[in-house]
Curated annotation (Swiss-Prot):
It comes from Shigella flexneri. The complex is composed of two ATP-binding proteins (GsiA), two transmembrane proteins (GsiC and GsiD) and a solute-binding protein (GsiB). CDD domains: TM_PBP2. This is Glutathione transport system permease protein GsiD. Gene3D superfamilies: MetI-like.
Amino acid sequence: MRLFNWRRQAVLNAMPLVKPDQVRTPWHEFWRRFRRQHMAMTAALFVILLIVVAIFARWIAPYDAENYFDYDNLNNGPSLQHWFGVDSLGRDIFSRVLVGAQISLAAGVFAVFIGVAIGTLLGLLAGYYEGWWDRLIMRICDVLFAFPGILLAIAVVAVLGSGIANVIIAVAIFSIPAFARLVRGNTLVLKQQTFIESARSIGASDMTILLRHILPGTVSSIVVFFTMRIGTSIISAASLSFLGLGAQPPTPEWGAMLNEARADMVIAPHVAVFPALAIFLTVLAFNLLGDGLRDALDPKIKG
C-alpha cells in the first residue's frame, strides 16, 4: 500500500502544473485561430470602423448630407474643402457617403436579422419534427429559391411600395429560406446525437431540447452565414434603390446615390465612384469576415 501511494505521489509530482490562465477555453481557441488570419482581422477592423461611422455619421459628416448645397462648385472633383467632390446639386459627396453608411448598413443588418429569426425557427421545427411539417416548409423554401433573389425582392416592393422599410422586408423574405435550410440540416444531424437521446430519456420537453441542446449547436453556422449574408443584403438593398424602388431622393443611400449619378458619370465620374467603392469595400469586408469566422469556428480546420 505504501509503495502504491509512493508511486501515485511520484506521478502527481511529475505532472506539470497548469495555471488557470493557461487553460484553453473555446473562446481562447477561437481567438487563437481567428487572429492568425490577417485578411479576416483587417476585415473585422474595417467592419468595426464602419459601424462606428454609421452610428455617428450625422456628427462626423462635415456638411448636412441633404440640405447643404454648394452652387459654386457643381460636379467639382475631390478637393480640400470637399474630400469626395460635389454632385450636380452641390451636395458634399463625402458627407452623403458617411450618412449613407448608416442607412445601407441598417437596411442590410435588419433584413438579415428578420431572415435569421424566422428562418431559424422554421429550420428547427422542420428538422426536429420532420414529416408533413418538414415537407411543407421545404416546399415553400423551394418555391422561394426558384426565383432569383433580386426578382423576388422587386416583386415584393412592387406590391408593398417603395421605401427603405419595404426594401428591408423584401430582402428579409428571400433570406428566410436560406437560413431555414441551414438550420434544418444542422438539426437533422444533432437530433441523432446521444446527448439528445439522453435528454429525452430524462423527460426533457421538445422545447427544452430545441432551445437548450439543438439551437446552441447551430449558433456557429448561423453566425458565419449571418455575417456573409449582410453583404448580400446590402447589395440587394442598393440594387433596389438604384432601380428607384428603395430609398428615394434626397435620402443619401448608396444605391440611390448611384441612381442619381448616372446622368453625370461621363463628366463627373467621382459622383458614382465613391458610393460604388463604399458598397464594394463593405461587401468585401463582410465576406472576408465571414470566411474568417468559418475557419476559426470549424473544428475540422487545424492550425
